[in-house]
């Protein structure tokens, strides 16, 4: 009895009930098997109709190399609703419920296909073993055959003919083609689970049918409520306006959202793959992307690259931020599935478009409104998304920027003011140290400069503080000279003033100053040489005779018209170079022999520069007298070339010039 029950259970599960000619069994057992076989055939006839429907819809859902998926890279968007067969009302109760349950289970199982792990496969196999022992043979056999080997049982293009196939020989032959009889243990079934990824996921659909059927009635109520809500609002273009293709697209989105909330998965923003997959459902075959939503809402909604280009619009409130974020993230993949959400702030566009008060995306008008800048902004308006019109308005309200030339002039004036302030502070600092008498002498000297020594036509501004003209072309050319940092030392201040004054002079005055500097440098070198020779030991008499002779020849023969006394220009340049009023106190404190500084200060204390130049004239005469001695000796024939007539004539000329200088 135990062996018979085990064999009967094996025949029920694996379908191993084929007859053989050499097998003999008792009549009673044979009759019971025939009765059971007839019952199995009757149940198979009804079960095969539902199985055929499941096969057809499952093949339609899979992304295989089918004929309807070759042209379209995306799956059919309305496979969950619009692919229902037009059956009669008599069998709609049973067939439609099973068919809808299967479709809903496949829609809900879409995300599960991409989240399978090794542990999940083990749980599926354990669940399958439980279902093998609990399900009846016919139901289990039909479901497993349909889910594991759908390509063998479904044929595309037959349509409703699949529902009426009830050939017993064909059914038995199909079982033989599947090699179902070759599976003899649970190890073979386990190997079947391990072979294919899609097979394990398909078995999970069978387990999810029972949970989906319970919520199917609730989904139908939501769909009916949505249809009633859409019919309450007037639509442009179509009065009754819901097409048979646009409704399933919305239903698919609702079901996917409900499944995601039921499973506790992350939001749409955290799963871009699921969002892109749901966006693909809105694409209809043979129509553009904008057609379903244009028929549903009566206006065209901008698609890709529309989230970042909607200008002159009010920002949505906090309640619609999710819809705007989803539209920004799904840029280039289709329209947002939150279009049914009413929003009064998004409906009021910047151009007064009130054709659709329930649009989540504002319509961009082709003509700019002239009073855009006068509109009131919502409190949640983001200043970072200001439009080009507002930016232009702000730019016109702001003052014009400074040109590079104006910036340069401003920088130069600032540096000049800093230099003058530094000079004034320096003078004030040293003026407290100088006695009152010395300060009065210094002021008298400074007052005598422009009156007695300076040519008022050319050099009247040498001692005055320079005035700066921003429009001067010379200052613009010399603007690089003023870019350096201001030095607090008096030497730099004097040099700065000298450069500024020279920049205002003409070419003739500059040439005179250049010649004066050259002559002053030459006279300084001569004085330095004279002082060195007077305090040093003379090595030979020949050197003392040759050097003055060569200098005298160069001075009197080459430059016969050179002035004996310096001109006012030379004196003015010398005063600008060497005059330091704050060194008077230090010069008075110096003890010992008279130094060049004390001699200069002594001449400056007299107050007028003609008196100051008397000492220089005396020194020049002394130098001339020293040069006359060698010249006289040369005239008497002491020179080696005394025999030549040319040298004698030169000596005579030099002697005569020396006599004139003495007179």
Curated annotation (Swiss-Prot):
GO molecular function terms noted in the UniProt entry: transcription coregulator activity
Main location: nucleus
InterPro entries reported for this sequence: LNK
Tissues where the protein occurs: Expressed in roots, stems, leaves, seedlings, cotyledons, inflorescences and siliques. Highest expression in root tips, young leaves and vasculatur tissues.
Disordered: annotated segments: 528-549, 590-663
Name under which the protein is recorded: Protein LNK2
Species: Arabidopsis thaliana
GO-annotated biological processes: circadian regulation of gene expression; entrainment of circadian clock; regulation of DNA-templated transcription
Keywords: Activator, Biological rhythms, Nucleus, Transcription, Transcription regulation
Segments of skewed composition (Basic and acidic residues): 602-629
Ranges of compositional bias, category Polar residues: 639-648
Keyword Nucleus part of the UniProt annotation: yes
GO cellular component terms given for this protein: nucleus
